[in-house]
Amino acid sequence: MAKPSGKSTTKKKVKKTVVDGIAHIHASFNNTIVTITDRQGNTLSWATAGGSGFRGSRKSTPFAAQVAAERAGQAAQDYGLKNLDVEVKGPGPGRESAVRALNNIGYKVNNITDVTPIPHNGCRPPKKRRV
């Protein structure tokens, strides 16, 4: 028979407070992914244009990227985040609007870096489309 225990010993999960973070914006031609991490690279929050309710060609618009950045930024504010470094990757249409949205939420954007991978003549690119 089980013993009746006097007190449960479960701990409440405490959210860590992070002041400085990095916003990684991956803007492809079809979608925009915004991930907010701490300085070590541990993910605090993320959002995508597709996950924000946009489907099809509307997913690849600057407005969809703005909504995704706002959703990721609001979720990261629970950690006490104040300062952001922004790393933008890719040629998509949502690059500038996502950075602007993070700035409008109230984050202090320290610097914006373009980390788009550029090959030094590496792999052969796919052939051009003939429509």
Swiss-Prot record:
Annotated GO CC locations: ribonucleoprotein complex; ribosome
SUPFAM superfamilies according to UniProt: Translational machinery components (SSF53137)
Biological processes annotated in GO: translation
Superkingdom field: Bacteria
Any single Pfam family the record assigns to this protein: Ribosomal_S11
Keyword RNA-binding part of the UniProt annotation: yes
GO terms of molecular function: rRNA binding; structural constituent of ribosome
Coiled-coil regions listed: none
Keywords: Ribonucleoprotein, Ribosomal protein, RNA-binding, rRNA-binding
This protein's record includes keyword rRNA-binding: yes
Entry's family note: Belongs to the universal ribosomal protein uS11 family.
Entry function: Located on the platform of the 30S subunit, it bridges several disparate RNA helices of the 16S rRNA. Forms part of the Shine-Dalgarno cleft in the 70S ribosome.
NCBIfam families: PRK05309.1, uS11_bact
Quaternary structure (record): Part of the 30S ribosomal subunit. Interacts with proteins S7 and S18. Binds to IF-3.
Name this polypeptide is given: Small ribosomal subunit protein uS11
Organism, as annotated: Saccharophagus degradans (strain 2-40 / ATCC 43961 / DSM 17024)
Gene responsible for this protein: rpsK
